[in-house]
């Protein structure tokens, strides 16, 4: 089963809280993790294969995830391949700017 964490904060960035939440909902069968945040004008996304700590281990992996609204996702594969293109949250700007995890 996948894990999803969403946070809205009136006055501050949410990426650290989403990261901490993803750590809590992950399990050993997980193959990918990602976070998307919204700063009021732009969507910021980072997603990689691996457990949460592996997906965000590179310096700066979370530094660009600014914004007071965000969603995080850990993927437990039941279909598809072991590829970063399967990692979520998914983002599209057509026809509307939206990011989602399921």
Indicate residue ranges for each PLM-predicted region:
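N-terminal glutamine amidotransferase
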Residues: 1-102
């Amino acid at each position: 089963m996948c894990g999803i964490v969403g946070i809205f904060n009136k006055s501050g960035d949410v990426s650290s809280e989403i990261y901490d939440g993803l750590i809590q909902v992950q399990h050993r069968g997980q193959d990918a993790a990602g976070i998307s945040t919204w700063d009021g004008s732009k969507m910021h996304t980072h997603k990689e294969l691996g457990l949460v700590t592996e997906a965000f281990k590179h310096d700066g992996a979370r530094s660009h995830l600014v914004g007071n609204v965000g969603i995080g996702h850990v993927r437990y594969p039941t279909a598809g391949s072991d590829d970063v293109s399967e990692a979520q949250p998914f983002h599209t700007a057509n026809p509307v700017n939206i990011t989602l995890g399921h």
